[in-house]
Design a protein with these regions (language model features):
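Short glycine/serine/threonine-rich phosphate/pyrophosphate-binding segments
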Residues: 41
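Extended beta-strand/beta-hairpin segments
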Residues: 1-33, 44-117
Length: 117
């Protein structure tokens, strides 16, 4: 299944367990990945504006799933900064990461209007 959005074609699939062939990420996997990549982009832009090298910055995301509800109960994001990263910007990196648009939409969700035509 492909989605077209703003000129991009985004491939998705379901796992074999749910009838797909596992050839592409499941839609929910893309959603989870969008959180981590959104944070990473915010960090990169922050650093670029201050001429801080970004090559050795890593963003790692983990999530905890409730086995009974199959819902994610916690998403943890670790931003690994190199030793030479300016100490005065460490807290600012967290603050800019919290401004991720994906995260903000989770906390203030849009109204959904699903209909058939």
């Amino acid at each position: 299944m492909n989605a077209r959005y703003r000129g991009f074609t985004i491939e998705t699939d379901q796992s074999k367990e749910y009838g797909g062939d596992g050839s592409a990420p499941e839609p929910f996997d893309l959603f989870l990945a969008s959180i981590g990549t959104c944070v990473a982009i915010n960090v990169i832009v922050f650093c670029q504006k201050r001429d801080i090298p970004t090559e050795n910055i890593t963003v790692i995301q983990h999530d905890e799933k409730n086995p009974e509800t199959n819902m994610r109960e916690k998403i943890s994001i670790e931003i690994q900064l190199p030793p030479e990263f300016p100490a005065k910007y460490r807290k600012a990196v967290i603050k800019v990461s919290e401004q991720c648009a994906v995260k903000r939409h989770i906390f203030n969700p849009p109204e959904f209007d699903i209909h058939v035509t």
